[in-house]
Amino acid sequence: MPYPERKIMTGQLASLIPQDNFIGLGLNQLNEVQQSFDLIINSTSASLTGDLPPIPDSIISSSACVYDMSYADKPTVFLQHAQKLGVLNTFDGLGMLVGQAAESFYLWTGYRPNVAPVIHTLRSSL
């Protein structure tokens, strides 16, 4: 998605959340931040090449939820790094992939499939 559309969508999301609870930042702004965050989402392609995204450790709180949109047969480098920093709630993008497919299936058929066995089957075949 081109940057202008992403910026518009970020603004729309921000309008739904009280301003003192929401900060949307680009990677180039993260080193200026003097706080940690409750939710960190890696949507870069860094995990596809086994690299860490350029996110400073100082913004990753052990109580945060850390999400990587990539997925693999084991936790991505980013998720492993977050776990080493003490983060207990780490998730990859496999559930989102299956959830989006299930939602599409529901829109076409009116039937909402159980995603848990699908995620389990896919995870075991990675």
Regions found by a protein language model. Name each.
Residues M1-P18:
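NAD(P)-binding Rossmann-fold cofactor-contacting core
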Residues K7-G11, L52, Q100-E103:
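Short, charged, surface-exposed secondary-structure boundary motifs
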Residues A14, S45, L122-L126:
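Generic secondary-structure transition motif, activating predominantly at the C-termini of alpha-helices
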Residues A14-P18, S43, W108-G110:
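Short, hinge-like loop/turn segments at secondary-structure boundaries
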Residues Q19-T90:
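Rossmann-like adenosine-cofactor binding region
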Residues M69-L126:
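Adenosine-phosphate binding glycine-rich loop
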